[in-house]
Swiss-Prot record:
Name of the gene encoding the protein in the UniProt record: rlmF
Pfam families referenced in this protein's UniProt entry, alphabetically: Methyltransf_10
Superkingdom of this protein's organism: Bacteria
Classification via SUPFAM superfamilies: S-adenosyl-L-methionine-dependent methyltransferases
InterPro entries: METTL16/RlmF, rRNA_lsu_MeTfrase_F, SAM-dependent_MTases_sf
Protein name: Ribosomal RNA large subunit methyltransferase F
Chemical reaction(s) catalysed: adenosine(1618) in 23S rRNA + S-adenosyl-L-methionine = N(6)-methyladenosine(1618) in 23S rRNA + S-adenosyl-L-homocysteine + H(+)
Length: 316
């Protein structure tokens, strides 16, 4: 298992945030900037509006994304961690490409559960110029993602599609002639609404901002039900994704998913073995105190993956 305890070397968010640069890019951030107990500029990460404006400033300053917003009560993602997943996935593609990350529109990625924030397609396109298809079961989330894509003139790079069957993840989503180098997925973490609420309250307490009058804490602990939990939790979702991926074994080079709970790995590895995959990779990722990992699998052996890369190069 490869160890990646800190941010990926290519991650743009190394070290402390440069608040003067962020405020210059998005002046509205100034009214949310505070001084933390260490005397450094920061924001109140328990304030959802502050987090939203902070993300907007980060995307403007670091990625040139001029327009970004999400509806209230939708997941507001921590961008450095989301960027790490993109870079770790890029390393996966480089593995069969002589160590070089493939870039450009010839590389196509599928973001399963793109969400209202559309964050993975934005980061993946900005860093590597990949083309994306983002799927979701939530029409409100897709409408928000579409507004972001259109406002930034990215319609040729990022397409969106609704998964009309809420019981399926991949099933019925892709056309027979579509090919994807990569799939991405940040699955629902919890197994029930109650578990999601308890998890949010723990994070709220850790921030020292517990408020008994609130029904649910805010911040990037917010989110719609389908963003936070599903029946059976993370292990059931990822295991279902593994099972459904078999149907698209020829059409996708690498399937990947984040897995937050290390205790879920044995069950997921059993599902991968049952599916008969040809290759598996597990890469540990860490941002601050949060640990996660990317699980990747392919139904193509090494020579088949190299042949896929050669075909892609010939189309450039």
């Amino acid at each position: 298992m490869t160890q990646k305890p800190t941010l990926h070397p290519r991650n743009r968010h190394q070290g402390r945030y440069d608040f003067p640069s962020l405020i210059k890019a998005h002046p509205d951030l100034a009214r949310f900037t505070i001084t933390n107990p260490h005397g450094k500029p920061s924001i109140d990460f328990a304030n959802p509006e502050a987090v939203r404006v902070f993300n907007r400033a980060l995307l403007k300053a670091q990625y040139g994304i001029q327009h970004w917003d999400i509806p209230a009560d939708y997941l507001c993602p921590p961008i450095p961690g989301r960027a790490d997943y993109i870079h770790v996935a890029a390393d996966l593609l480089a593995e069969d490409n002589a160590g070089e990350v493939p870039k450009g529109a010839q590389v196509r990625a599928l973001d399963i559960g793109v969400g209202a924030n559309c964050i993975y397609p934005l980061l993946g396109h900005c860093d590597y110029r990949w083309r994306f298809l983002g799927s979701d079961i939530d029409p409100v989330a897709l409408a928000s993602a579409k507004a972001i894509v259109q406002a930034n003139g990215l319609s040729k790079a990022i397409a969106l599609r609704q998964q009309n069957n809420a019981k399926l993840i991949l099933g019925g989503l892709l056309e027979e002639d579509e090919r994807f180098d990569l799939t991405l997925c940040n699955p629902p973490f919890h197994a029930s609404r109650e578990e999601a609420t308890r998890g949010s309250q723990r994070k709220w307490k850790n921030l020292g901002k517990q408020d008994p009058k609130r029904k649910l804490p805010v911040l990037n602990f917010g989110g719609q039900n389908n963003e936070l939990w599903c029946e059976g939790g993370e292990i059931r979702f990822v295991s279902q994704l593994v099972g459904e991926s078999l149907q698209y074994a020829v059409q996708v080079l690498w399937f990947t998913s984040l897995v937050s709970k290390a205790s879920n790995l044995p069950g997921i590895e059993a599902a991968l073995k049952k599916a008969g995959v040809k290759a598996v990779r597990i890469v540990e990722m860490g941002q601050g105190q949060k640990q996660s990992r990317m699980v990747a699998w392919s139904f193509h052996d090494h020579s088949q993956r190299q042949a896929w890369n050669e075909r892609r190069k010939s189309q450039a």
